Amino acid sequence: MKIEVNNELISRLQNLALVELNDREKERIKRDIKNILDFFDQINKLDLSNVEPLFHPISTGKLRKDEIIKPLSRDEALSNVKRKEDGFIVGPATYGE
């Protein structure tokens, strides 16, 4: 499936990223995204059926056995928390609040 990189896509990405872009920046990002997608298209066209994997992202030799353990109580979980309120952990404010 070919992704069409157009102004609508750039506007959607801009809104998702919560950034403001000028026209020059939008054109540069549009060009960069097209180049990245073209590069992935080239990679996808490679025949790798006879190539053995050289790396596995998850090492199967270092996994521990699943064991049921006693969970922390609320008091234990909150014992080392710097900021708490009404029995809940208070985290940092997020964007827009």
Curated annotation (Swiss-Prot):
Transmembrane segments: none annotated. The keyword ATP-binding applies. NCBIfam families: gatC, PRK00034.3-4. HAMAP family: GatC. This is Glutamyl-tRNA(Gln) amidotransferase subunit C. GO terms for biological process: glutaminyl-tRNAGln biosynthesis via transamidation; regulation of translational fidelity; translation. Coiled coil: none annotated. Its EC number is 6.3.5.-. Allows the formation of correctly charged Asn-tRNA(Asn) or Gln-tRNA(Gln) through the transamidation of misacylated Asp-tRNA(Asn) or Glu-tRNA(Gln) in organisms which lack either or both of asparaginyl-tRNA or glutaminyl-tRNA synthetases. The reaction takes place in the presence of glutamine and ATP through an activated phospho-Asp-tRNA(Asn) or phospho-Glu-tRNA(Gln). It comes from Sulfurisphaera tokodaii (strain DSM 16993 / JCM 10545 / NBRC 100140 / 7). The keyword Protein biosynthesis applies. It is an enzyme of class 6 (ligase). GO terms for molecular function: asparaginyl-tRNA synthase (glutamine-hydrolyzing) activity; ATP binding; glutaminyl-tRNA synthase (glutamine-hydrolyzing) activity. Belongs to the GatC family. Heterotrimer of A, B and C subunits. It comes from the Archaea. Keywords: ATP-binding, Ligase, Nucleotide-binding, Protein biosynthesis. It catalyses: L-glutamyl-tRNA(Gln) + L-glutamine + ATP + H2O = L-glutaminyl-tRNA(Gln) + L-glutamate + ADP + phosphate + H(+); L-aspartyl-tRNA(Asn) + L-glutamine + ATP + H2O = L-asparaginyl-tRNA(Asn) + L-glutamate + ADP + phosphate + 2 H(+).
